[in-house]
A protein has these predicted regions:
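C-terminal outer-membrane beta-barrel translocator/porin domains of Gram-negative envelope proteins
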Residues: 262, 266, 270, 350-354, ...
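Outer-membrane beta-barrel domain signature, especially the mid-to-C-terminal portions
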Residues: 540-542, 635-637, 677-695, 725-732, ...
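Gram-negative/organellar outer-membrane beta-barrel architecture
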Residues: 162, 273, 293-528, 616-617, ...
Length: 747
């Protein structure tokens, strides 16, 4: 295969190999210039073959995609077609780059941002190989024109009054740089003001700008003028009339039954509506005899769509009659129900070269509108199974080493079941979740532990980017159903396990806040913080009854209860690197502090690292706390949890071909104890030991994007374990590997 990159370049063309540094002239450096500069460079940017991270300036000396294209694109064999389609990249030709057109686009962009005297020129720079060329751009900006004044002209009196009342919200101010985008935004703002006050038919295009750049040097005097000729309905305020609600189970369904109220009609099929009308009315802000408001329309559409009940939602507004005096819009809301049931499966698989292997799965079904009130009923079962594939571990003669299974039932109500907050305006429909769950943890040859829990949770959202979740009551009970003599010996050797795995109640309260940046952000961020506490209100009751706060052995239903405070946080940021690659950074941390009735937090509440979504070079609970390590198979995976956790991940994701993506990653972290339990040596957190006690792993992976979910395969390789000295201290390459199969991204 020839490695020539110019063998298929047409005689009258050249291969584009990048830009030279763009030269800027005749400008004043300020914030406006820097913002415009970014837009100009985006307009002029063109990635050559083999571009490094999508750069227009730097390229790899090995443009393998172009080489493959040159070698196979002209062949008609099946293999050649597959190679070309999967790996080949056609040459980026100068004729396709079209620098003349790009210079014109950049020049128009400058003028739309106030640089009316700008000029963009280009130069084609032929390389040593005459079939290759770079492009050099020179950008001359000239004076920046600023806003002198803005007048609103020719608007009807009532509309003019609305303009005057909203002048404090105007986006155009004297002295601001001239920007077409701001002018358009101001025109849209006025349109929203009008449409939120009854002017249903008003559109931004019914007003236009006139600009005077001559009267005052380097400034623009603006007039926003209402059009002389517009449809009659545009000048009129409109009120909502009758409301018709159509509920269909399919798009083509003909409705034959109805319920009629004074201003409200529901059309459906059957003896009664498939959905209680109050569920829709609660989210419908447009009401009969009220002025039309576009914000109310948007909020209604968002909330009704957000219930998840419907696959199609459509609003239609129709004038009641055609007379010039008509000011009433009858509204028809058409809703088509989504399929009532959802069936889902989640799966993962972990393999460890030291001998642990096992799958895990969640299988569930959801029922929408379960009781005609918009409720969502969800039932799922889950399980994981792990066995020993090696022959050196204690208990390896057993075919089954451990398994876990459980079930969850939850009911989500589309409202807050609270006596207050009823008039608060939410971004999305809030919800109340009632949940019950049960799980069994079995460690073959050691114990079987049962955890049952119930919770009440409120979800609410005030803005598009922030989600709140508050659980005022979570009641959890953990108890042993079976324990072998061997595990009894382990417990006697390890007082820490004796405390953390004791039978106990865990009455909790929890609050979480989640921030997700808008979808329009090129480099989005995600941040979540979760705060929870256990038994403090219960202990206050004991305190009122005369028992000391720090006294031990207080009970709930004749069983001891746990008492602690816990905080967790999770942060990730994604940087776009080209069109099909990303760099993702992730940090998580957590702390739990036990006090009062507890010496140590329950085992299920403690932190651990390792696994498919953590430090992928190591198995779950196989690292920490601190520099603690045991070679005993009897206690490994049981006591390797901690009170304090730090974890950081860096992952680069890139497209290989089609929907198949590759990844390379670096994971670091550990857990530590905050109290000396007298058993797990070197487990306490100390700042001076932070770096050497941080586990480190790297690896590569594959992701196959099926649009609705992602299949992920990660191969992790250990670099550093906390319990040995030296940087690379893995005993052997074979023992420092883990293979994980999972669904979804790790963060």
């Amino acid at each position: 295969m020839s490695c020539s990159s110019t063998k298929n370049i047409p005689e009258d063309d050249q291969l584009f190999v990048g830009l030279t540094k763009i030269e800027y002239k005749d400008y004043e450096k300020n914030d406006h210039f820097l913002a415009v500069q970014e837009e100009v460079e985006a307009a002029l940017a063109t990635a050559p073959n083999g571009a490094l991270f999508g750069s227009s300036y730097h390229r790899s000396p090995f443009p393998y995609g172009l080489w493959i294209w040159n070698a196979f694109s002209k062949s008609r064999s099946v293999f050649s077609k597959w190679m070309t389609k999967s790996f080949g990249k056609p040459p980026v030709l100068m004729s396709r780059v079209n620098p003349e057109l790009r210079a014109k686009v950049a020049n128009e962009l400058l003028r739309s941002n106030g640089y009316f005297d700008s000029n963009v020129e280009y130069d084609v720079i032929t390389q040593k190989n005459p079939k290759k060329a770079k492009i050099g751009y020179t950008v001359s900006l000239g004076n920046l024109y600023r806003i002198d004044s803005l007048r609103y002209v020719n608007f009807p009196p009532r509309a003019d009054s609305l303009i005057r009342s909203s002048l404090g919200e105007t986006l155009i101010h004297p002295g601001d740089p001239f920007k077409v985008s701001v002018l358009d935004a101001e025109r849209t703002r006025l349109s929203n003001v009008f449409r939120n006050n009854g002017y249903y038919y008003y559109q931004p295009g019914y007003a236009s700008y006139l600009a005077d750049t001559v009267s005052v040097a380097d400034t623009v005097q603006l007039r926003l003028q209402f059009a002389d000729s517009v449809p009659d309905g545009v000048r009129r305020k409109w009120y909502i009339g009758k409301v018709n609600l159509e509920l269909r189970k399919g798009f083509m369904e003909t409705l034959s039954d109805s319920l009629v109220h004074r201003y409200f009609t529901v059309r459906f099929n059957g003896r009664k509506p498939p959905l209680r009308t109050r569920v829709i009315l609660r989210d419908l802000k447009l009401r009969p005899r009220r002025l039309y408001s576009h914000d109310d329309y948007l909020q209604s559409a968002s909330k009704i769509t957000g219930t998840g009940l419907f696959s199609f939602v459509d609003f239609k507004f129709t004038p009641r009659d055609t007379t010039l005096s008509c000011d009433t819009l009858d509204m028809t809301l058409s809703c088509v129900f989504d399929k009532p049931y959802d069936f889902y499966v989640e799966a993962n698989m972990v393999g460890k070269t030291s001998g642990k292997l096992g799958p895990g799965a969640v299988i569930g079904i959801s029922r929408r509108n379960a009781f005609r009130g918009g409720e969502k009923l969800d039932i799922n079962i889950n399980g994981s199974y792990e066995w020993q594939t090696g022959h050196n571990a204690d208990g390896s003669s057993s075919e089954m080493n451990s398994y876990e299974y459980g079930a969850n039932v939850s009911l989500e109500l589309p409202r807050l079941v609270l006596p207050f907050w009823r008039r608060v305006r939410w971004y999305n429909t809030p919800s109340t979740i009632l949940k019950a769950s049960s799980s069994v943890i079995n460690r073959s040859g050691y114990f079987k532990r049962h955890i049952v829990s119930g919770e009440l949770t409120y979800n609410f959202q005030r803005t598009a980017t922030s989600v709140h979740q508050f659980s005022p009551l979570i009641l959890q009970y953990e108890y042993m159903t079976h324990m072998t003599e061997a595990f009894g010996d382990v417990m006697n050797e390890n007082p820490y396990l004796l405390v953390t795995m004791a039978d106990q109640f865990v009455p909790k309260m929890r609050y979480s806040y989640t921030y997700s940046s808008p979808a329009t952000y090129r480099n989005p961020i995600y941040w979540q913080v979760v705060v929870s506490e256990a038994s403090n209100l219960l202990s206050l009751g004991y305190l009122a009854a005369g028992k000391k706060w720090n006294s031990k052995y207080k009970q709930m239903f004749k069983n001891p209860y746990a008492q602690f405070f816990k905080i967790e946080t999770d942060f990730s940021k994604t940087w776009a690197v080209g069109d099909h690659s990303q760099l993702v950074g992730h940090v998580s941390a957590g702390l739990i502090w036990s006090y009062g009735n507890s010496e140590s937090a329950p085992y299920s509440e403690q932190f651990y690292v390792g696994g498919a979504n953590s430090i992928r070079a190591f198995n779950v609970r196989s690292i920490g706390p601190g520099a603690y390590h045991t070679d005993s198979e009897r206690t490994s995976y049981m006591d390797q949890t901690g009170d304090f956790k730090l974890q950081a991940n860096l992952e680069y994701r890139f497209r290989l071909f089609g929907n198949l993506y590759g990844a390379t990653f670096l994971d670091a972290g550990n857990v530590w104890a905050l109290r000396d339990d007298g058993y797990r040596t070197n487990s306490l957190f100390k700042v001076k030991n932070l770096l050497k006690e941080t586990a480190l792993g790297t690896g590569v992976g594959l992701r196959y994007d099926l649009e609705f979910f992602v299949l992920r395969l990660d191969w992790g390789v250990g670099l550093h374990v906390p319990y040995k000295s030296g940087f690379y201290n893995i005993s052997s390459f074979r023992d420092g590997q883990s293979l994980h199969f999972a669904i979804g991204y790790p963060f």
